[in-house]
Swiss-Prot record:
GO biological process, one term: negative regulation of translation
Matching SUPFAM superfamilies: Ribosomal protein L13
Gene responsible for this protein: rplM
Pfam families: Ribosomal_L13 (PF00572)
Family per record: Belongs to the universal ribosomal protein uL13 family.
Taxonomic superkingdom: Bacteria
A Gene Ontology molecular function term of the record: structural constituent of ribosome
CDD domains: Ribosomal_L13
Protein's organism: Allorhizobium ampelinum (strain ATCC BAA-846 / DSM 112012 / S4)
Organism lineage: Bacteria, Pseudomonadati, Pseudomonadota, Alphaproteobacteria, Hyphomicrobiales
Protein name: Large ribosomal subunit protein uL13
Family annotation (HAMAP family): Ribosomal_uL13
Quaternary structure and interacting proteins, as annotated: Part of the 50S ribosomal subunit.
UniProt KW keywords: Ribonucleoprotein, Ribosomal protein
Summary of the function given for this chain in its UniProt record: This protein is one of the early assembly proteins of the 50S ribosomal subunit, although it is not seen to bind rRNA by itself. It is important during the early stages of 50S assembly.
Entry's Gene Ontology cellular component terms: cytosolic large ribosomal subunit
Length: 154
């Protein structure tokens, strides 16, 4: 018996929707990264984009554990001398684009390369509960029920 190898033409992508309200960022990001890469399928092939399309709503209501909300710092560089910039997770979540905290967490769990960039395009993150993907009939995935530690109890 030979090893199964998925061909790009045989890939069947589904649409999955996840409500991120009250979920821990890192634990949610691992589930999303698994679905984007297709590792939850028995047909997983490392060099083929056979992951699903993932829609995340309520990204502004994600939770960070410990003191990460105030202490976690995101850095980037403008490209100019002395152009290092930084923002805390709190500043980003309370700012204009709160979904970027979750996007960065997932992006850093996906391999960096052409395949990883293609897989990241299958992720759609929305700060609120509205999304324009009703026509795709996404299947709801309840991440909170997968493990009790996925939800942060107050």
């Amino acid at each position: 018996m030979s090893t199964f190898v998925q061909k790009p033409a045989e890939v069947e992508k589904k649409w999955v929707i996840i409500d991120a309200e009250g979920l821990v960022v890192g634990r949610l990001a691992t589930v999303i990264a698994t679905y984007l890469r297709g590792k939850h399928k028995v047909t997983y092939t490392p060099h083929v984009d056979d992951g699903d399309n993932v829609i995340v709503i309520n990204a502004e209501k994600v939770v960070l554990t410990g003191k990460k909300y105030t202490d976690k710092t995101y850095y980037w560089h403008t490209g100019y001398p002395g152009g290092i910039k930084e923002r805390t997770a709190r500043q980003i979540i309370e700012g204009r684009f709160p979904e970027r905290v979750l996007e960065k967490a997932v992006e850093r769990m996906i391999p960096r390369g052409p395949l990883g960039r293609r897989q990241m395009k299958n992720l759609r993150v929305y700060a609120g509960s509205a999304h324009p993907h009703e026509a795709q009939q996404p299947v709801a995935l309840d991440v909170a029920k997968l493990n009790s530690k996925n939800v942060r109890s107050a």
